[in-house]
């Protein structure tokens, strides 16, 4: 009996040491790029109204016409109902949108990535977008079909950001030493970040197709690892009051949480007035959001926004 107990304890100890070793190797692999650059995490805020009013009317008109966002939607055949919902709703406000599918789908037009691996799909979609549209768009927004995005608010947030700088924006999450932008809230890359990412896609030592790890990590973490090698780091996007504008939950869930945690300040405790994304929506909720954001109007009440972003010609502005 004593011998069996001793063998059991040895097995537990060896197992614990092995797990610890694996964990250390994982952190070394993910954090490898941190030795190349020192970076303090930033919280980037949207401009306030006073900043916009300082811009001349002619400049505002030029900005509203020239500011262009290319949208990338990663979809799978099982997402066909969500695919239909985003196609009928908010993606009409992108200056250009392409759907990248894991396989050929007859129901909707898409670009076939011929893989079900989300990281490979993301890599291929970014390469396609850069190769084809690098001279036409300065900002690239990637999202899931469960995400609802308000593109006008995204453009407003990016208004004073220079796309020739390496921006990598959204809702940031920390995992060990790695900070990354969660795909749940959508990911924004500037053209400079796209250039740097594209230069690394063919270098497996820095941006491997399979992550090069003992276990597989999510596609948004893999993207952050690759970008880190290029000196591009995750930035959390916030409004002028410090509230997150890229959200990984639905409006309904935020309101439910606010009613529990801040019963006397439900609206203030919920979400930013300039929110860009919400996630985890059903197809019906997509259409409800579209109604609330673009269609519902209070008669006689006029919004005097300093800047107007119009959707591309031929799209339904709702």
From Swiss-Prot:
Q: Which GO terms describe its biological process?
A: protein O-linked glycosylation
Q: Where are the transmembrane segments?
A: 7-26
Where are the Cytoplasmic topological domains?
A: 1-6
Q: Which GO terms describe its molecular function?
A: glycoprotein-N-acetylgalactosamine 3-beta-galactosyltransferase activity
Please state which protein family the record places this protein in: Belongs to the glycosyltransferase 31 family. Beta3-Gal-T subfamily.
Quaternary assembly: Associates with core 1 beta-3-galactosyltransferase (C1GALT1), probably not with the soluble active form.
Name it. C1GALT1-specific chaperone 1
Q: What is the lineage of its organism?
A: Eukaryota, Metazoa, Chordata, Craniata, Vertebrata
């Amino acid at each position: 009996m004593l011998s069996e107990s001793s063998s059991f304890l040895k097995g537990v100890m060896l197992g614990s040491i092995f797990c610890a070793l694996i964990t250390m190797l994982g952190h070394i692999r993910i954090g490898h790029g941190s030795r190349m650059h020192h970076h303090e995490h930033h919280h980037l805020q949207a401009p306030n109204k006073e900043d916009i009013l300082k811009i001349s009317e002619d400049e505002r008109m030029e900005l509203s016409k020239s500011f262009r966002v290319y949208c990338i939607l990663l979809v799978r055949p099982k997402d066909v109902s969500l695919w239909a919902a985003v196609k009928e709703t908010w993606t009409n406000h992108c200056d250009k949108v392409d759907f990248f599918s894991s396989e050929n789908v007859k129901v909707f037009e898409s670009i076939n990535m011929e893989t079900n691996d989300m990281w490979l799909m993301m890599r291929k979609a970014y390469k396609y977008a850069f190769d084809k549209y690098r001279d036409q768009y300065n900002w690239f927004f990637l999202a899931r079909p469960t995400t609802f995005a308000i593109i006008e608010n995204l453009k407003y947030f990016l208004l004073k950001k220079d796309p020739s700088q390496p921006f990598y924006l959204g809702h940031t999450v920390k995992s060990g030493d790695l900070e990354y932008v969660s795909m749940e809230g959508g990911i924004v890359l500037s053209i400079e970040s796209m250039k740097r990412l594209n230069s690394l896609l063919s270098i497996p030592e820095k941006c491997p197709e399979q992550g090069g790890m003992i276990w597989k990590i999510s596609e948004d973490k893999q993207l952050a690892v690759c970008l880190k090698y290029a000196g591009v780091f995750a930035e959390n996007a916030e409004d002028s009051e410090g509230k997150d504008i890229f959200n990984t939950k639905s409006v309904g869930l935020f309101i439910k949480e606010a009613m529990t945690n801040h019963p006397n300040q439900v609206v203030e405790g919920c979400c930013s007035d300039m929110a860009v994304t919400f996630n985890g929506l059903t197809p019906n909720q997509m259409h409800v959001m579209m109604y609330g954001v673009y269609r519902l109007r209070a008669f006689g009440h006029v919004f005097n926004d300093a800047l107007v972003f119009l959707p591309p010609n031929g799209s339904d502005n709702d």
